[in-house]
Curated annotation (Swiss-Prot):
Heme b binds at H58, H87. One of its GO terms (molecular function) is heme binding. GO terms for biological process: hydrogen peroxide catabolic process. Belongs to the globin family. Involved in oxygen transport from the lung to the various peripheral tissues. This is Hemoglobin subunit alpha-D/D'. Residues 1-141 form the Globin domain. It comes from the Eukaryota. PANTHER family: HEMOGLOBIN FAMILY MEMBER, HEMOGLOBIN SUBUNIT ZETA. One of its GO terms (cellular component) is hemoglobin complex. The lineage of its organism: Eukaryota, Metazoa, Chordata, Craniata, Vertebrata. Keywords: Heme, Iron, Metal-binding, Oxygen transport, Transport.
């Protein structure tokens, strides 16, 4: 459960992500593809080379979706319902992959935010991204 302090930290930190959605998203995806190569199977039609337009475009979509979730922290299920349907019923993505991408996104935040990515911010984002992953996996049950 996100506390009021967690939500404030997430919103304040998210302001620093603004303007970098494509870069941060592409970097998180690249980290995931390298660290967890099995995740590439969900992108057979993509050019997965670093910096490709497809990876950058999808990275931007991912981070923008997270931005919408940040705006809707009190109602994640409604905010992410369409994405949950898409990933569960159309794309059939194994829900474990949401956790893998979350981990990679946290690394990207830590790299780019440096000392501003405090243990408290890390904890808040861990809770938030876990909640997002859980909501995205709801339709699999």
């Amino acid at each position: 459960m996100l506390t009021a302090d967690d939500k404030k930290l997430i919103q304040t930190t998210w302001d620093k992500v603004q303007g970098h959605q494509e870069d941060f998203g592409a970097e998180a995806l690249q980290r995931m593809f390298i660290t967890y190569p099995q995740t590439k199977t969900y992108f057979p039609h993509f050019d997965l080379s670093p910096g490709s337009d497809q990876v950058r475009g999808h990275g931007k979509k991912v981070v923008n979706a997270l931005g919408n979730a940040v705006k809707s922290m009190d109602n994640l299920s409604q905010a992410l319902s369409e994405l949950s349907n898409l990933h569960a019923y159309n794309l059939r993505v194994d829900p474990v992959n949401f956790k893998l991408l979350s981990q990679c996104f946290q690394v990207v935040l830590a790299v780019h935010l440096g000392k501003e990515y405090t243990p408290e911010v890390h904890s808040a984002f861990d809770k938030f991204l876990s909640a997002v992953a859980a909501v995205l996996a709801e339709k699999y049950r």
